[in-house]
Design a protein with these regions (language model features):
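Mid-to-C-terminal alpha-helical segments outside catalytic/metal-binding sites
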Residues: 1-10, 17-42, 202-204, 214-250
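Active-site beta-loop-alpha junctions enriched in small/polar residues
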Residues: 9-11, 15, 48-49, 79-83, ...
Length: 250
């Protein structure tokens, strides 16, 4: 069974990297060994330094794009801090690359520090114009339906499925343009994946690791109480369907 990790991160040697220790590694070579062990073919990356600080977002996007172009396993989410106008121009110039999956936003306090509702129209109208995916860390989830309905050419992945809000907004979106992913620790709940598949269908759920153990994340789907077709959709088919040009060789 092929696997595409649509949502992960890594450090890049920046002073704004996230600390790692013996218990949780965030460096690229370690993550690639995890990929090999678990049979993951490729990942959609953004640098931690671009998400947890607003100081090197432009530089991080540029550096990661170079890495993606030189490594078949690496695909990119372009990080957008909507307070920085230069990033809109950068993203516009890179979005058509076969190594780019879309836009990543991280509004939370301690990260880019903005009110998602204050900047939502600016972000999502831009994505609507580009007809691209936006991957967001969960923030004011129930408010996102209005923007998905307002900007139907934008597709929104609200990451880290963990509860009823994720499921309900997927059901409520008028144009079917809200999705979620399995990344993060919350998927360890023993019925969250199964319940989400029952309610919204496996076609709305992407696989991601978020740098949590690939063995745990892949095992959570492989041994879930869902059909083989549902497992294939989450682990591979959905990414392949929605990112045809990017993953055409996988």
């Amino acid at each position: 069974m092929k696997i595409i990790d649509l949502h992960t991160h890594c450090n890049c040697g920046s002073k704004f990297d996230i600390a790692e220790n013996e218990f949780h590694q965030r460096n690229f070579p370690f993550l690639m060994e995890e990929y090999r062990n678990c049979g993951i073919s490729a990942g959609g990356f953004s640098y931690y330094s671009s998400l947890f600080s607003d100081k090197e977002v432009f530089e991080g996007n540029a550096l990661l794009h170079e890495q993606a172009l030189s490594d078949d396993r690496v695909y990119q989410w372009l990080v957008l801090d909507p307070k920085q106008e230069i990033l809109f121009a950068q993203i516009r110039g890179l979005i058509k690359s076969d190594k780019v999956l879309g836009i990543k936003i991280h509004s939370l306090l301690g990260c880019h520090n903005y009110d998602i509702n204050e900047y939502a129209d600016k972000i999502f109208s831009f994505a609507d114009e580009l007809k691209c995916f936006v991957l967001m860390h969960p923030d004011k989830i129930t408010d996102m339906v209005q923007y998905a309905d307002k900007y139907p050419n934008m597709k929104l992945i609200i990451a880290h499925v963990y509860g009823m809000e994720h499921i309900e907004v997927i059901e409520q979106a008028k144009y079917g343009n809200i999705f979620t992913d399995t990344s993060g620790g919350a998927s360890n709940a023993n019925n969250i994946i199964e319940y989400a598949v029952e309610r919204v269908g496996s076609e709305k759920i992407f696989f991601g690791t978020d740098t949590y153990s690939c063995a745990f994340q892949t095992g959570r789907i492989k041994y879930a109480r869902i059909s083989e077709k549902d497992k294939e959709n989450i682990l591979y088919n959905n990414a392949k369907k929605h990112f045809k040009e990017q993953f055409k060789a996988i």
